[in-house]
Regions:
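Patatin-like phospholipase
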Residues: 1-69, 77-198
Length: 198
């Protein structure tokens, strides 16, 4: 895990580097201090997914790390695995499927967003993540979740898939409509409640 203080310093370094246009970023990126920060927001994440696809298409991909909260963590998986269109495709293809997100899913699984369907069935079978590409990409990924015991943000280092997919699920487990995700003795919910923009 990374402390909140370290994250704020990283954000300050990124802000001080300037250069927001794509041409400058792709040619002059300094990977020692450049991070991609992705906020959550449920279906607002579809906009982020589109922006990430354009960044990848334009070759703006040389980030040291990607940090995502909730939907941002879900989008980060497809960005790091170099799968253009995957995050948007999933949101559009399954938006009306009651296993993806529905009251029925809440009643039958305890989660409005069907955890098993999203993080196992889609992730491994219906629109699989390229785990090999994810794991071989040197870019580091962090999913921001909320530690329920302490009420503080937790920056979970997603080192490999499929092993660490529960960290992504923890980051996107919305309070009152999702079950808490337990990892290493800690219980987590959606990172948006403690640090929506890491």
């Amino acid at each position: 895990m990374v402390s909140q203080h370290d994250t704020k310093l990283l954000n300050k370094d990124v802000a001080n580097n300037g250069a927001l246009d794509g041409a400058s970023l792709s040619k002059n990126q300094n990977t020692s201090s450049t991070a991609l920060i992705l906020e959550g927001g449920s279906y607002r994440g579809i906009f982020t997914a589109g922006v990430l696809d354009v960044l990848r298409e334009k070759g703006v991909t040389n980030f040291e790390s990607v940090w995502g909260t909730s939907a941002g963590a879900i989008n980060a998986v497809s960005f790091k695995s170099k799968q253009i269109g995957r995050a948007m495709r999933i949101m559009l293809a399954f938006r009306d499927d009651p296993r993806f997100m529905s009251f029925r899913s809440l009643v039958t699984t305890g989660n409005t967003a069907g955890g098993e369907f999203m993080y196992e069935e889609i992730q491994n079978h219906l629109d699989p993540c390229d785990n090999e590409a994810f794991n071989s990409n040197p870019m580091q990924m962090y999913a921001v979740a909320s530690d329920v015991t302490f009420g503080t943000p937790a920056y979970l280092h997603v080192k490999s898939l499929p092993n660490d997919i529960k960290m992504v699920q923890a980051s996107a487990s919305m309070p009152t409509v999702s079950r808490m995700v337990e990892l290493d003795g800690h219980r987590y919910l959606d990172g948006g409640t403690t640090d929506s923009i890491p």
